[in-house]
């Protein structure tokens, strides 16, 4: 963090050391550090994070109380839908 701030005066540049005991400076420093850490983590793991947000939350309807045969039929329907979607991609 920057602890020295150069401010122009009428005659010359003087070096004014900011006092880090100021609560506003402390809060801004903490927020800045947290923002930097979160940004770095986001850039490093964005594929994993957004894939999980996109597909992890779509788990389908609850299967509580549904017979196993119907669950298996539902799984096969979902898989066949995925297989059909794969046919739309063209390899170049």
UniProtKB/Swiss-Prot annotation:
Q: Does the keyword Lipoprotein apply?
A: yes
Give the record's membrane topology.
Single-pass type III membrane protein
Describe how its activity is regulated: The M2 protein from most influenza A strains is inhibited by amantadine and rimantadine, resulting in viral uncoating incapacity. Emergence of amantadine-resistant variants is usually rapid.
- Residues the UniProt record annotates as site (Seems to be involved in pH gating): 39
Q: Where does the UniProt entry say this protein principally localizes?
A: virion
Q: Which residue ranges does the entry give as Virion surface-facing topology? A: 1-20
Q: Which residues carry this modification: Phosphoserine?
A: 62
One Pfam family per UniProt: Flu_M2
Lipid attachment in record (S-palmitoyl cysteine):
48
A single Gene Ontology CC annotation of this entry is: virion membrane
Which residues are listed under the site Essential for channel activity, seems to be protonated during channel activation, and may play a role in the channel gating and selectivity? 35
Q: Which residues lie on this side of the membrane: Intravirion?
A: 42-92
- Annotated keywords: Disulfide bond, Host cell membrane, Host membrane, Hydrogen ion transport, Ion channel, Ion transport, Lipoprotein, Membrane, Palmitate, Phosphoprotein, Signal-anchor, Transmembrane, Transmembrane helix, Transport, Viral ion channel, Virion
**Transmembrane feature ranges:** 21-41
The protein's superkingdom reads Viruses
Q: Where is this region: Disordered?
A: 60-86
Q: GO MF annotations for this entry?
A: channel activity; proton transmembrane transporter activity
Q: Where in the cell is it found?
A: Virion membrane; Host apical cell membrane
Kindly give the InterPro entries that the UniProt entry links to this protein: Flu_M2
Q: Which family does it belong to?
A: Belongs to the influenza viruses matrix protein M2 family.
Query: What is the annotated quaternary arrangement, including any partners?
Result: Homotetramer; composed of two disulfide-linked dimers held together by non-covalent interactions. May interact with matrix protein 1.
Function in brief? Forms a proton-selective ion channel that is necessary for the efficient release of the viral genome during virus entry. After attaching to the cell surface, the virion enters the cell by endocytosis. Acidification of the endosome triggers M2 ion channel activity.
Question: Could you share any additional remarks the record makes about this protein?
Answer: When the channel is activated, one or more imidazole moieties of His-35 probably become bi-protonated.
Domain comment as written in the entry = Cytoplasmic tail plays an important role in virion assembly and morphogenesis.
How is this protein named in the record?
Answer: Matrix protein 2
Gene behind the chain = M
């Amino acid at each position: 963090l920057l602890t020295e701030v150069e401010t122009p005066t009428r005659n010359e540049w003087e070096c004014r050391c900011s006092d880090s005991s100021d609560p506003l400076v402390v809060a801004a420093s903490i927020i800045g550090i947290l923002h930097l850490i979160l940004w770095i983590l986001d850039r490093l793991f964005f594929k994993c994070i957004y894939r999980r947000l996109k597909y992890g939350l779509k788990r389908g309807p609850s299967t509580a109380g549904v017979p196993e045969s119907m669950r298996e039929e539902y799984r096969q329907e979902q898989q066949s839908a995925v297989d059909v979607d794969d046919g739309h991609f063209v390899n170049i």
